[in-house]
Amino acid sequence: DELLEATKAITKNLNIEISDKNLNYLINNSKRDIKNIFRTLTQLEKESLERKKSIGLNLIKEIIQSS
């Protein structure tokens, strides 16, 4: 899937650590456009740094619901 590969490239470039399982969840449960996914990833990174926690499924769900 091109969207998955593009999203993996974004996470690599931004040094965001997220499992493939969680990345797939993000793609499958949010708007499937690269701008939205990029915005969500940057928000996930910000929240994970503020909370000093890794990016997990609960945080992904929270961010998706708030957007």
What is the role of each PLM region?
Residues 24-28, 35-49:
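C-terminal helical "lid" of AAA+/P-loop NTPase domains
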Residues 3, 17-29:
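Short conserved motifs of the RecA-like P-loop NTPase core
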Residues 4-16:
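Conserved AAA+ ATPase "sensor/coupling" helix adjacent to the nucleotide-binding pocket
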Residues 33, 40, 56-60:
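Short, hydrophobic-biased amphipathic alpha-helical segments
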Residues 1-4, 20, 34, 41:
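Amphipathic alpha-helical transducer elements in NTP-driven molecular machines
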Residues 48-66:
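Conserved C-terminal helix/linker of AAA+ ATPases
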